[in-house]
Structure formats: structure tokens, C-alpha cells
A protein has these predicted regions:
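C-terminal cap/loop subdomain of S1 sulfatases and analogous C-terminal strand-loop tails that border
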Residues: 11-38, 55-59, 63, 68-147, ...
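Short, flexible loop/turn motifs enriched in small residues
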Residues: 39-43
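Structural micro-motif
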Residues: 44-47, 71
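Long, internal low-complexity/basic segments
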Residues: 70, 119, 128, 133, ...
Length: 198
């Protein structure tokens, strides 16, 4: 049996703007942001996994992973062969669970498409190694941070690290092009009207 425990992203906004947000406190360990945005406080979540004797008890890692990694990881654990006629954004975490170094093949990409989020101008974030870029709804780089040196995202490096900026932005544009050219996205047509809650 494989048990995975994780949580929804980010605690609710401090204003508790909606009735169901009242008394739903949450902390981010001082990280910038909360739910509805792309700062680390809005996207970082815990994850706990138990898989009998296959994973050492008490093992802890701070290696960045994300939800899209679970599909290839679970498929790998169950010896299930994934179809090869499509691209998977995540990658198997088996090396990490075996206490080896996880070599990322692709950057981590986060998207938010909510017109009523805290900062409605931001739509994408890309993380590659220690660097993270936040991109606005016009697909323009807006923020750049070295999360190893600046985990609280206070020192915007846009314009100060042109090589890193160009590299990250190029990877984002490739990812975005792949999404825009995906047959399911093309079949869907224009984006559907966002759902609003209460």
C-alpha cells in the first residue's frame, strides 16, 4: 500500500474574503504570499509518503517537487508503463525516495488563471534550480528570485541577471508553446469562463 498525504496550496488570504474562509488560519513560515498567488507562500505544500519498507522511515528532503511528479512516480512504483504517445510534465521521484539526487529534466511550472486572485496580473511561475521567475498575463517576466539566497522573495533580480532571465524565459516560452499546440487545448478552443465561488 502506498499512502501519500499532501495539502491544498497556500493558506487562505488574511482578509478571509469569503464566508467559508473564516477561521481557516494558516501560516507560511514567513514566506511571501498566500493562496491565490505564485509566491512561495502560495504554492509550497508539505508531502508525506509511506510505502512499507521501500522508503526509509523519517527521511526528509527539501528538494523541490510538484504535483505533476506523482503520476510518473506512482506508475514507476507499480511497474505500470505509461503511454509513450504524449508528454508528461512531471518526472518520477524514485531517485529521491531512494535517497539519491533527483536530476530535474524540466523546470517546475506553476500556473494560475483566476481573475480575482490577490495579484490578477500574474499568471505563471517557472522554477529551475535555485531560480524562480514570475510571469504576468501578457507573458512578460515580472519578478526573478534566487530562492537559495532569498527564500522570502524580496530582492527582485529582473534586469540584474540577464543570462538567467533569458534562460528561464526561453524555457517558459517552450512550455507555453507546447501547451498552446496541445491537441486537447486546441479542441477546447478559447478558455472557458473561470468559475467563481460564492
Amino acid at each position: 500500500t502506498i499512502v501519500i498525504f499532501t495539502s491544498d496550496n497556500g493558506p487562505v488570504t488574511r482578509e478571509a474574503r469569503k464566508v467559508y474562509e473564516l477561521n481557516l488560519a494558516g501560516e507560511t513560515d514567513g514566506l511571501r504570499g498566500r493562496k491565490d498567488n505564485l509566491w512561495e507562500g502560495g504554492i509550497r505544500v508539505p508531502a508525506i509518503i509511506k510505502y512499507g519498507k521501500h522508503i526509509p522511515q523519517g527521511m526528509v528532503t527539501d528538494t523541490p517537487v510538484y504535483g505533476l511528479d506523482w503520476l510518473p512516480t506512482l506508475a514507476n512504483m507499480m511497474n505500470f508503463k505509461l503511454p509513450t504517445d504524449r508528454t508528461y510534465d512531471g518526472q518520477s521521484l524514485i531517485p529521491l525516495l531512494e535517497q539519491k539526487t533527483l536530476k530535474r529534466e524540466k523546470p517546475l511550472i506553476f500556473g494560475i488563471d483566476m481573475p480575482f486572485q490577490d495579484d490578477p496580473t500574474d499568471e505563471w511561475a517557472i522554477r529551475d534550480g535555485d531560480w524562480k521567475m514570475i510571469i504576468d498575463r501578457e507573458n512578460k517576466p515580472k519578478y526573478l528570485y534566487n530562492l537559495k539566497k532569498d527564500r522570502f522573495e524580496t530582492l527582485n533580480q529582473i534586469g540584474k541577471q540577464p543570462d538567467i532571465e533569458k534562460q528561464l524565459y526561453g524555457k517558459f516560452l517552450k512550455y507555453k508553446q507546447d501547451i498552446d499546440n496541445d491537441s486537447l487545448m486546441k479542441a477546447r478552443g478559447d478558455k472557458p469562463t473561470p468559475v467563481t465561488w460564492g
